[in-house]
Every structure is written in structure tokens, then in C-alpha cells.
A protein has these predicted regions:
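Short, acidic/turn-prone active-site loops that include or flank metal/cofactor-
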Residues: 1-3
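Catalytic-site signature of metal-activated, phosphate-bearing donor transferases
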Residues: 5-11, 24, 31-211
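Short aromatic/hydrophobic "clamp" motif used to bind/position activated sugar donors
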Residues: 19-21
């Protein structure tokens, strides 16, 4: 049973019980501005759209603004309109309904300290290293000119196709830290880009190589 199976089980269960669904992880907190935006949508009783929410990362007790740390995710939707991609890794909520963006942030406190973050990502990297990407059926299209999620999928697809497993994490770090201005988040911005791209992605590539030995 993977993340997709669990989410879709809950979605289908509450399709019969609720008009709307808002999906959060345990380490995510809504800002007051986002709560206000959600209340306006619910009060309108209009169910024509599904809604993307801006996820902002809190890393080492600092809210990050650059380096690709913030992205949009479909989290609020009328029941019976949305499911999660049935994949092992990098799942997204998908819907045929038109999408709109909500004001306010969803703050994601990704770990209480760097040691716990490293432990969890070490375990996570082992799962990712076992995935055979060519066999994964994705529902979200990879589209540079699409919405935020489709654009992220496009860049991830390009990253996975890059031939050098040694250079991929280095290029990703350079892209996030310099081109996506991760350095503007100061010292914590460097640590985030280093651990999230260079360290984490190198660890995945090393485990992929180890699995072939």
C-alpha cells in the first residue's frame, strides 16, 4: 500500500460524507490569509473549480522564498472531482476541473531539526532508488508552458533523462542556488539547496549504482 492508495481510499470514503475536501500533511499549517481565502470559497457554494495552494518551506526555523522551495499544489476541491496519481513516487492530486489559485500560504515545517531531516531523507532515498522510472505511468503531463505542477514535471523529466548520474545533482544545485536565487535566503538557503539537491540527489544516484552491484 503506497501513498496514492492511502490518499485515494480516504478521498473516496469522504466523497460520500463531505461536499469539499482539504488535504494536509501533519507538518503543514495554514496561514490566516489562506484560511480566509478558503472560507470565502466554501461560503460561495460554487463548485466549478479546484484550487491550488502555495506550499512554502520552513527549513531550520526559517521560511524560504527562493531556490525553488515554494510551489503550488492542488489541495482543496469539491468531492468526487479529484484523485491522486497512482504512482510510487512524486504523486500529485489530479482533476479534470478548471484550476484556480488561492491567496495565502501553506507553511510546511519539513523537519524540527537537520538530523531528523537527514534520517527521513536517507530512508526516502532508498525508496526512490528502487523505482524504475520508465515503468511509471504519470497522470500529470510534463509541460513547460503548463501550470506550476506540469512545469515541475517537465523539469523533473529532463533531469531524469540527463545521462550523467555524477553531474545531475551538481547541475541541479547550481540551478536552484544561482538561477532560482537560493542564495537570497542567506545561509539557510545554501543549506537547503545543498542538502535538498546536491546531497539528497547524489545519495539517490549512489544507491541506484549500489543496487546494480
Amino acid at each position: 500500500i503506497n501513498y496514492s492508495n492511502q490518499r485515494n481510499f480516504i478521498i473516496r470514503k469522504y466523497n460520500k460524507l463531505c461536499d469539499w475536501q482539504l488535504h494536509l500533511d501533519a507538518d503543514e499549517i495554514l496561514t490566516q490569509k489562506l484560511i480566509k481565502s478558503i472560507n470565502i470559497i466554501l461560503a460561495s457554494e460554487e463548485k466549478k473549480h479546484v484550487y491550488l495552494i502555495k506550499r512554502s518551506v520552513i527549513f531550520m526555523k526559517k521560511k524560504l522564498f527562493f531556490g525553488g522551495s515554494s510551489n503550488w499544489h492542488l489541495r482543496l476541491f469539491p468531492s468526487k472531482t479529484t484523485l491522486v496519481e497512482n504512482t510510487t513516487y512524486d504523486q500529485h492530486f489530479v482533476s479534470s476541473k478548471s484550476k484556480q489559485y488561492l491567496s495565502g500560504d501553506l507553511n510546511d515545517f519539513i523537519s524540527s531539526n537537520i538530523s531528523k531531516w537527514i534520517i527521513s531523507h536517507n530512508n526516502y532515498s532508498s525508496s526512490i532508488a528502487k523505482v524504475k522510472y520508465k515503468n511509471i505511468k504519470k497522470t500529470v503531463n510534463a509541460n513547460f508552458f503548463g501550470n506550476n505542477i506540469e512545469r515541475l514535471r517537465f523539469f523533473k523529466k529532463m533531469y531524469l533523462k540527463f545521462p550523467s548520474s555524477f553531474l545531475k545533482p551538481i547541475i541541479l544545485f547550481i540551478y536552484k542556488y544561482f538561477f532560482l536565487l537560493g542564495f537570497l535566503d542567506g545561509k539557510v538557503g545554501f543549506y537547503y539547496c545543498f542538502f535538498n539537491s546536491l546531497w539528497f540527489r547524489t545519495l539517490i544516484e549512489a544507491k541506484k549504482y549500489e543496487n546494480k552491484l
